[in-house]
């Protein structure tokens, strides 16, 4: 049986845990050679040891501007070209009232959730266009439309990510490069650990959340559609 992504390459940010790790597993299981990006080197190496098709470990901190260039250079060296699939799953999840939010909170959240994806797209989109094919997946959130008290910073970054995805899609129309925004509801990953959602009345219990594999399934479905099919956006919620 031929795997749907056999011979393809993919780069996944935030791949050390949670949704990013689940996406990396799903793409590798479908035949892709996967590049793994995160600052958690040990976790990346542990994940890589479980994946087929010679995964590539590219540890870096995407909150720093030079990281996009370094990651791109490593991916180009390993793959020989821009990846066929770029999944922008790295993110941070600050919660708290606006009053009391620190400059560090703001800088980190926007750097990782909003700015880093654009830096990576800037590095890889020209190669995808020259090849006439590529697929960029932005990991969004229902917070790009739904805002509640204490998630002002996170929601603002995800509104920015939505705008970026829509702009990249519009700028790439007719080039063979597709862009998909995948926006899940609350998903049970370690990103929730500091917030103890089961103890907070305004937050969903963890057993009511999506699983990382649910989101990975959606990403895999989007990137395995025929080349003439654009999946602009997928919004996922728990039934």
Which residues does each predicted region cover?
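Substrate-binding pocket helix/loop in short-chain dehydrogenase/reductase
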Residues: 97-98, 105-110
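Active-site helix of classical SDR
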Residues: 121, 157
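Conserved glycine-rich cofactor-binding loop
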Residues: 9, 16-17
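Active-site loop immediately N-terminal to the catalytic Tyr-X3-Lys motif
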Residues: 99, 148-152
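Residue(s) in the substrate-gating loop at a strand-loop-helix junction
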Residues: 141
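Conserved glycine-rich Rossmann-like NAD(P)H-binding loop of the short-chain dehydrogenase/reductase
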Residues: 30-47
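C-terminal helical subdomain
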Residues: 174-182, 202-239
